[in-house]
């Protein structure tokens, strides 16, 4: 619904069930492909996705995911958890208070600066996807708003980009993956249904403000639990 993908929630949830972190990241990427893919199909039918900016982002993200996947295998688990929890704190706070949104909303970049931002943005999305398994949507949405896109178009285009960024990152991780097939299938079905509901809510006239705040609180709670585990 918000175009950021669900992996930011999947990773801490799966890790909290006892799954190893890299396995949780790989599973989250697969779920991101399913959920963002199901939502992206609706966005494409409704012509809400701007392919002119989505395709370049996907291409550069595909390169970044290989770098991120390589770094994930070299980085100690505690460091990955720390980076992930910091990102969760930032995104959760932004969902609640929209402080950063006030900075980028109303600004618009065009010309050469736009091309440079797309290139850098694609790499960042890819690295985040490969390193943390988050899809990079939390970075894409504000970037597209800065490029002059409306909120709904930015969220829809971001959701489309997240599908392919997650796919590239999944391929970078899958060779080390040992999944619990039954658990993964159950979560895929639940996530697919949730994505369909969320995408339809976004296309309707229902405001996303309340949902943003609920998700923001959830992220802050999960980040606090991860940090508590690291400090204990």
Stretches with model-predicted labels:
Residues 1-6, 45-50, 147-156:
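Membrane-helix interface "capping/anchor" motifs
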Residues 19-27, 52-53, 148-159:
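Membrane-interface alpha-helices at helix entry/exit sites of multi-pass transporters
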Residues 30-37, 63-64, 71, 161-168:
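Membrane-embedded alpha-helical segments of transport systems
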Residues 115-123, 142-146, 159, 163-167:
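Hydrophobic alpha-helical segments embedded in the membrane of multi-pass proteins
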Residues 11-17, 21, 41-126, 147, ...:
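Juxtamembrane transmembrane-helix boundary motif
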Residues 25-33, 155-163, 192, 219:
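Transmembrane helix-bundle signature of multi-pass membrane transporters/permeases
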Residues 2-11, 132-143:
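Transmembrane helix boundary and interhelical junction motifs in multipass membrane proteins
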